[in-house]
């Protein structure tokens, strides 16, 4: 965890404390573009919450970093609340992932991790009505859907009606907000790409409907791309046609193809790079996927 991620995580824990100690509903909205570590923050907070009762009374003094001290102090406060107000009953937590493929992956990660993380925590949007949740985390909340161009209208309609909502008027974000006392949303409006995804205005309108206590947070540091935030902003400017001036960025190539086959060929050439060796071998007919599973990246 970076200092920024740790700070946002600690602030969200404080949001949760405020929600429960003041017996109100609360929302934490975390904005961050791709590669800023939203998933890392989500899992870290969930892990901390699941192990809150194991926090020792004198553990604050073990840390030199102020953020770590604040986080432990917040968790101790939360522990006191759980012991006194909930008779030691842990929070019921759900981790909503809208995308089925990614949901299966994270479910397996939780299964292998243990330490309070269990695969049943990882759920889809339709599952929020199946349990009484205290806290719901939603990764990629920009992928929450409305009733448009779906593969399963039946499950959408059924879930909506269970909550007393009109299927034609509601959306999956509204489901989530109805099903927990505190909701933590990780959001990037630029990653809403399907016609079924909520638009930025639809998302905001839904929040306005429920956000009596809305806390804003932001992850700014780009962790996935060497070019960092300036590179991301430059690409956004190009895609939005707000910056037409050519800019040379060190260690990056800009290639324009008029033949998709040449684009694919160039990508395959690059796949010899680290972590893509398996795919490169398969693409070039050197072996089947099953034959290169044991290949080690050096």
Which functions belong to the PLM regions below?
Residues 38:
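Conserved lysine of the Walker
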Residues 1-26:
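N-terminal pre-P-loop "Q-motif" helix
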Residues 135-216:
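Signature of the SF2 helicase/ATPase Hel1-core->accessory helical subdomain module
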Residues 41, 45:
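Hydrophobic positions on the alpha1 helix immediately C-terminal to the Walker A/P-loop
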Residues 30-32:
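Hydrophobic anchor at the beta1->P-loop junction of P-loop NTPases
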Residues 48-59, 89:
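Post-Walker A helix-loop "phosphate-sensing" segment adjacent to the P-loop in P-loop NTPases
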Residues 86-136, 142:
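Inter-Walker segment of RecA-like/P-loop motor cores
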Residues 196-199, 211-234, 239-298:
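Conserved helicase/translocase motor-coupling segment
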